[in-house]
Amino acid sequence: MTPRHLLAAGDLSRDDAIAILDDADRFAQALVGREVKKLPTLRGRTVVTMFYENSTRTRVSFEVAGKWMSADLINVSASGSSVSKGESLRDTALTLRAAGADALIIRHPASGAARLFADWTAGQSDGGPSVINAGDGTHEHPTQALLDALTIRQRLGGIEGRRVVIVGDILHSRVARSNVTLLHTLGAEVVLVAPPTLLPVGVADWPVTVSHDLDAELPAADAVLMLRVQAERMNGGFFPSVREYSTLYGLSDRRQAMLGGHAVVLHPGPMLRGMEIASSVADSSQSAVLQQVSNGVHIRMAVLFHVLVGLESAGEEGAA
């Protein structure tokens, strides 16, 4: 992990990732029993969120994380900024740097946008603001991978040696890419299940096993991560019909019964109930969907701490 940014899951060494997971747990514990959920950890720091794509879970959890750590939080949307008047992404980045922001959290539809932000705002004596990638096109979503890993660790007691099956639209999924990288770093075995049309070129070079048969992979799965079909990123027919896709790749009640009793079901959201996952499965005791949301806040607290304060234990800071 670079000292000031989190741009991709590959930025994290195994030790870095475990430190963030551990600190997320510590922050969660530090908040237990507090009537007012406020820690002084980032008091005096200015954090700017910039979301050029719609978001509920990621945006809200970053905002809650910043507020709970006492940061001064500023939200910038494309429609409410000079971007709507034609300002370039580079000029926006330089403006926020000049304004003195300590951290920039960016989501953008273009792959690589977060790294460009980091490059454009660097190079001066103070090093520029920290940049956190909240999702860039189909490229990366590192904090989602971290919260998924935390959820798996909490549910299963560990990640190393666990078999994680990722199902659905791998081609358009930044969540899948970040999860594959991070889970491999943490020692998990990753299986991708998708129709051939929803697998990216070059997937044979990824550290994964590829399958087209969901029924065959479920009995040995420790965790199943269901992905939404991202129709907004498609301009052609990737599968014959929603009904056929759901029949072949949806997590139904019948398929849930194939899972071991210990297995956990995850979904990064938003869920298309009745397509990739049945409502009964999403609301079952094996589902960790809401636990993922809660963990998202604590993971993003840990990430903000690590990029703004440093790669060290958050225990004393969190308990202050």
Curated annotation (Swiss-Prot):
Pathway: Pyrimidine metabolism; UMP biosynthesis via de novo pathway; (S)-dihydroorotate from bicarbonate: step 2/3. L-aspartate binds at K85, R174, R228. One of its GO terms (biological process) is 'de novo' UMP biosynthetic process. It is an enzyme of class 2 (transferase). InterPro entries: Asp/Orn_carbamoyltranf_P-bd, Asp/Orn_carbamoylTrfase, Asp/Orn_carbamoylTrfase_sf, Asp_carbamoyltransf, Asp_carbamoyltransf_Asp/Orn-bd. It catalyses: carbamoyl phosphate + L-aspartate = N-carbamoyl-L-aspartate + phosphate + H(+). Keywords: Pyrimidine biosynthesis, Transferase. One of its GO terms (cellular component) is cytosol. Carbamoyl phosphate binds at R57, T58, R107, H141, Q144, G269, P270. GO terms for molecular function: amino acid binding; aspartate carbamoyltransferase activity. Its EC number is 2.1.3.2. PANTHER family: ASPARTATE CARBAMOYLTRANSFERASE (PTHR45753:SF6), ORNITHINE CARBAMOYLTRANSFERASE, MITOCHONDRIAL (PTHR45753). Catalyzes the condensation of carbamoyl phosphate and aspartate to form carbamoyl aspartate and inorganic phosphate, the committed step in the de novo pyrimidine nucleotide biosynthesis pathway. Belongs to the aspartate/ornithine carbamoyltransferase superfamily. ATCase family. Heterododecamer (2C3:3R2) of six catalytic PyrB chains organized as two trimers (C3), and six regulatory PyrI chains organized as three dimers (R2). This is Aspartate carbamoyltransferase catalytic subunit. The gene is pyrB.
